[in-house]
């Protein structure tokens, strides 16, 4: 199997971060069920008891009774996350008891060792230390204070009081339990420092990310990102089509701003917002840019949108050429020439690729300037989850783009008509389609009709 590229690896890790029950009620119900299993299984096997109802109910009562204490130590008092923590922690507790039962059969022991139940409780507590510090925003001291409350309460109501001291002072428990607790503490301490000096606290970043995803609140993460952001001057190019009576107009927009970093942070929906700013009569294309040009906050997004009102016209015209398309191996460049302004579309379709590198843009723009073009607008029509573009493909795209520009210089220009339609009123609510919708531009040039299709679906 070929090694995955970096983009795919990040996508996999992002997907793993979203593994959670769909509802905290599901987590609560599952936690209660698992706690009941722990009580019944431990009582019947490890303790050899025939009375299962009392230990089962006692463990469930301890779980529910201590559950509300967790939110007191969580940074945002989020009950749902606390319930998710209990579900995974109780699962570890139960797995440990099952391992002990399996070990008895595997090693042909005469009886079950309570070590595995006690160890399950300690592993549960260790897990809680890690989660409370990273996800729930507790300090190490608070995490230690709360870590043992739920697992220890469940343990004490399950295990007879005359067995407490012997089970908890077992040398192996002290050794392995101390190791787990030490690892959890060290892991929490070191991971929080992993982002320094650029990042004050890695845990704050994780908590802000979780908040943005679970509560759709971008503010904490935007505040962190803004601290490391820098000012830059960007341009936004527009190709405006207007009817002779000026009653209808339509625009092809190429912002240097790149959509991102991800929903709902910063300019993640910049395409849809520009579309609305243009009265829903625009195609907002992907220019040659990358995630270095993400807007970090909603405030910067609004500043950018307001700046669009300051647009100035560089050139006016009423003619264009018929489209030209040039293919070099996997690379394809297509374009039209509007008077002296070229519109280029670069693609490796149907092959995927990541964002085109800036040098492709600068080299094409320099080539166009040398050929006396007024301006060249370059659209990056890449597939979002493709691999980083190779040197060979990049060179082929440059050759195809230059050949297209040279050919456009020789093409005859014609007056043209345009028509535009989008899905604004079609109620297309699909996960793959963002707020910029789907649109089609029709150009009638030299008595021939050409269509340009577009969807706000890249990121």
Predicted regions and their residues:
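Terminal domain-initiation and capping elements
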Residues: 2-459
């Amino acid at each position: 199997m070929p090694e995955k590229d970096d983009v795919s690896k990040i996508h996999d890790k992002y997907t793993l971060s979203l593994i959670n029950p769909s509802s905290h009620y599901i987590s609560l119900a599952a936690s209660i069920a698992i706690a009941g299993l722990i009580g019944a299984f431990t009582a019947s096997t490890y303790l050899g008891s025939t009375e299962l109802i009392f230990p089962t109910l006692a463990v469930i009562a301890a779980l529910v009774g201590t559950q509300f204490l967790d939110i007191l130590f969580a940074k945002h008092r989020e009950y749902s996350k606390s319930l998710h923590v209990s579900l995974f922690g109780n699962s570890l507790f139960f797995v440990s008891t099952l391992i002990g039962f399996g070990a008895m059969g595997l090693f042909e022991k005469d009886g079950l060792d309570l070590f595995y139940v006690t160890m399950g409780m300690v592993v549960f507590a260790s897990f809680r230390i890690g989660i409370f510090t990273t996800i729930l925003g507790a300090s190490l001291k608070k995490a230690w204070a709360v870590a043992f409350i739920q697992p220890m309460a469940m343990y004490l109501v399950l295990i007879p009081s005359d067995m407490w001291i012997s089970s908890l002072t077992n040398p192996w428990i002290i050794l392995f339990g101390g190791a787990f607790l030490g690892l959890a503490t060290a892991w929490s301490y070191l991971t929080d420092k992993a982002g320094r000096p650029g990042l004050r606290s890695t845990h704050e970043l994780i908590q802000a990310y979780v908040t943005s995803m679970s509560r759709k609140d971008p503010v904490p993460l935007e505040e962190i990102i803004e601290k490391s952001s820098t000012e830059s001057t960007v341009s936004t190019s527009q190709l405006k089509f207007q009817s002779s009576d000026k009653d209808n107009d339509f625009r092809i927009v190429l912002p240097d701003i790149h959509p991102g970093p991800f929903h709902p942070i910063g300019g993640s929906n910049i395409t849809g917002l520009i579309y609305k700013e243009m009265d829903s009569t625009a195609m907002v294309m992907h220019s040659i840019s990358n995630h270095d040009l993400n807007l970090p906050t909603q405030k910067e997004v609004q500043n950018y949108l307001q700046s669009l009102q300051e647009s100035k016209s560089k050139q006016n015209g009423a003619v264009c050429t018929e489209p030209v398309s040039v293919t070099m191996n996997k690379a394809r460049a297509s374009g039209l020439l509007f008077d002296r302004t070229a519109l280029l579309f670069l693609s490796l379709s149907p092959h995927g690729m990541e964002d085109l590198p800036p040098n492709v843009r600068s080299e094409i723009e320099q080539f166009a300037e040398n050929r006396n073009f007024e301006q060249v607008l370059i659209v990056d029509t890449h597939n979002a989850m493709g691999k980083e573009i190779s040197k060979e493909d990049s060179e082929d795209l440059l050759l195809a783009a230059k050949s297209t520009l040279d050919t456009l210089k020789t093409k005859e220009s014609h007056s043209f008509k345009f028509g535009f339609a989008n899905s604004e009123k079609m109620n297309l609510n699909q996960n793959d389609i963002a707020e910029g919708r789907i649109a089609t531009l029709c150009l009638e040039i030299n008595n021939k009709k050409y269509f340009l299709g577009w969807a706000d679906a890249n990121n």
